[in-house]
């Protein structure tokens, strides 16, 4: 028996234990990624003394997500790993997730990229979001849509992308992009709210 598949099946069996827990995990696995989007918008829009650093963090995290997603897309084209619910009829895909490439877990990968940046820049709430990213990752196994190694692969790609961004000229590009994005968003909000 494949240990990766066995773990998914055992975790997924817990869906029959508690309806409330299953509903909670369903909400996390389907909509949990929105927590990162909302947090990013709050970081960008909130007033305060460290606004420039918060906005730079948002841009770096966004660049990381874009690069990691491109890598994930390329991996999925080269190697289409079947999802756990495709390989074992006992695994219940209660989210209705489509049967596309399983490796890596994009939710885990993108959550890890964002959290790495938040922790690196000491953003408020970063530790709480790190815990939530872990819960989101676990929910993907619980839902029967990913293997543990999909999660590990996602975190590994996130780490590589994080190193790439901070080890190349991308960090300076992010600074220029932050300045431009700040000017545009500030102008838009001034225009909207001064009318």
Please describe what each predicted stretch is.
Residues 89, 93-195:
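Membrane-embedded catalytic cores of phosphoryl/pyrophosphoryl-handling enzymes
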């Amino acid at each position: 028996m494949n240990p990766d598949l066995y773990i998914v099946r055992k975790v997924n069996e817990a869906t029959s234990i508690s309806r409330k827990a299953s509903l909670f995990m369903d909400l996390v696995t389907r909509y949990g990624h929105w927590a990162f989007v909302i947090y990013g918008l709050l970081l960008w829009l909130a007033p305060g003394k460290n606004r420039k650093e918060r906005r730079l963090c948002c841009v770096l995290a966004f660049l990381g997500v874009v690069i990691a997603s491109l890598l994930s897309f390329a991996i999925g084209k080269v190697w289409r790993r079947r999802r756990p619910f495709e390989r074992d009829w006992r695994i219940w895909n209660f989210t209705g997730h489509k049967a596309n490439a399983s490796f890596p877990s994009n939710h885990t990968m993108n959550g890890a990229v964002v959290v790495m940046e938040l922790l690196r820049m000491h953003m408020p709430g970063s530790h709480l979001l790190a815990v939530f990213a872990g819960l989101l990752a676990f929910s993907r196994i619980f839902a029967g849509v990913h293997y543990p190694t999909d999660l590990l692969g996602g975190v590994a790609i996130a780490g590589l992308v994080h190193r790439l961004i901070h080890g190349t000229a991308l960090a300076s590009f992010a600074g220029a992009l932050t300045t431009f994005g700040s000017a545009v968003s500030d102008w838009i909000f001034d225009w909207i709210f001064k009318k």
